């Protein structure tokens, strides 16, 4: 009886935490998308929530911004509090109200996204720019690297004196290639991706 109650309680807590994470993720993604739509003046198309197949399952990318000045692969983090970490650390730390929370290094997370996008094309590496954008009231307490920024730095970081790389025809090809390879946006695709993540976690567990 006790084990049944514990199981039910665990499921309820897990569901609630999952909903909270998804809600926070959606807020961050909306803020990034709205900022780009309002202030980024270069010719571009923004692809959101891009799920692509990989050799080991799937990867899900918050944003792929295809612009005439490059292909930006963007990971969004809607966090507040103090953020500690570094490019080479496997985990970073959020400190909020004296509570410490560990989370995966988003640079490493986004590197996998970047390599998946790069694999679709035969373009120079410098055409692809990874960015991690924090959209909450976070304060960086250590050097997180040049490609980790706050939302209010996004537009300046996107432009940053970059030369034009693609004409309209090339941009259309890049967008079409990603759209052709991505899985259809749906709840089923999201659940499929989550199941792949759970499977990888189980495989790593002793």
Q: Model regions: which residues?
A:
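Acidic/histidine-enriched active-site and ligand-binding environments that engage anionic O-linkages
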Residues: 85
